[in-house]
């Protein structure tokens, strides 16, 4: 669903931001 897609995008964004 839309929320699942949004969560996936947000998770990827956070993962990139938290990468050293």
From Swiss-Prot:
Record GO cellular component, one term: extracellular region
Record's keyword terms, sorted: Amphibian defense peptide, Secreted
Record's subcellular location: Secreted
Major localisation: secreted
Record bears the keyword Nucleotide-binding: no
Keyword Secreted: yes
Tissues expressing this chain: Expressed by the skin dorsal glands.
Gene Ontology molecular-function annotations: nitric-oxide synthase regulator activity
GO biological process, one term: defense response
Role according to the record: Has no antimicrobial activity. Strongly inhibits the formation of NO by neuronal nitric oxide synthase at micromolar concentrations.
Protein name: Dahlein-5.3
The species this protein was found in: Ranoidea dahlii
Lineage: Eukaryota, Metazoa, Chordata, Craniata, Vertebrata
């Amino acid at each position: 669903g839309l929320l699942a897609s949004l969560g996936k995008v947000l998770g990827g964004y956070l993962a990139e931001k938290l990468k050293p």
